[in-house]
Amino acid sequence: MTDASKRTVRLRAEHDGDNSRYLDASLDMGGSLVIKGQDLGPATAIVSSDGEYEWTSTFAPVDIPALVALLGGAEGADILDVLESYTDRRSYELERLIRDSDVPHSLFTWSG
């Protein structure tokens, strides 16, 4: 395992009453970028019967340069370094940019 595959960027860790929201990014062993989110609490009721909603967006290594460019990073920049500027409240902007872009990625969602 490389050092890069061990690194995780905490994009969001929010707590508001009974609700919590988390978002993390890391590189997997194959070099894909994996962004994982988890929402817990009554605010998830619209999508989850048990108070938990999870999702994972995965970007293949070949698509990471396009994501770096979308996020304003320099050519060749480390995606995890670029993502360091999208933490806390800015993590919502990150999600919007990804959602509105044509950068290829897979999306997996789970709710109880």
Q: Which residues make up each language-model segment?
A:
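Short, charged/polar N-terminal "headpieces" of proteins
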Residues: 1-34
